[in-house]
């Protein structure tokens, strides 16, 4: 027997709106990478360590990209904390374990910062493995 849908509450509507903003932000970030000749290999990839927003490849370079949308680019930059960087690195390691053919590629951890005002900044090498 199917469960009835959850009640429509203000909290649920906020969560749905945040989810939609996140998807739109990831679309914008993917477009930034594609404009730089990257091919998107994965979006919102869930692993046991956490989620990878975007995984992209250009030639012999594999990029794990975190997307941050905030009111301003400065707020977006501040939101990428050490704990999250470690989670992204762990998720990337799991991704590579599942895709050993990509392991020989050069690897980089980027961030694409997006402001709600439309601003965007691509931080290449935003953090390192030691992160």
UniProtKB/Swiss-Prot annotation:
Tell me where the transmembrane regions lie: none
A Gene Ontology molecular-function term? nucleic acid binding
The family database entries (InterPro entries) matched by this protein are listed as:
Restrct_endonuc-II-like, tRNA_endonuc-like_dom_sf, UPF0102_YraN-like
| Pfam families cross-referenced by the UniProt entry | UPF0102 (PF02021)
Family that this chain belongs to: Belongs to the UPF0102 family.
Q: What is this protein called?
A: UPF0102 protein AZC_4471
Species of origin: Azorhizobium caulinodans (strain ATCC 43989 / DSM 5975 / JCM 20966 / LMG 6465 / NBRC 14845 / NCIMB 13405 / ORS 571)
């Amino acid at each position: 027997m199917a469960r009835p849908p959850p009640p429509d509450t203000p909290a649920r509507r906020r969560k749905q709106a945040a989810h939609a903003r996140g998807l739109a932000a990831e679309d914008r970030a993917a477009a930034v990478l594609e404009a730089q000749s990257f091919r998107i290999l994965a979006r919102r990839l869930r692993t046991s360590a956490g989620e990878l927003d975007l995984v992209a490849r250009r030639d012999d370079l594999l990029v794990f990209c975190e997307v941050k949308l905030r009111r301003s680019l400065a707020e977006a930059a501040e939101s990428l904390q050490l704990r999250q960087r470690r989670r992204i690195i762990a998720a990337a390691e799991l991704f590579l374990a599942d895709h050993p053919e990509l392991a020989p590629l050069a690897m980089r951890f980027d961030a694409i910062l997006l402001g709600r005002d439309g601003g965007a900044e691509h931080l290449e090498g935003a953090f390192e493995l030691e992160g």
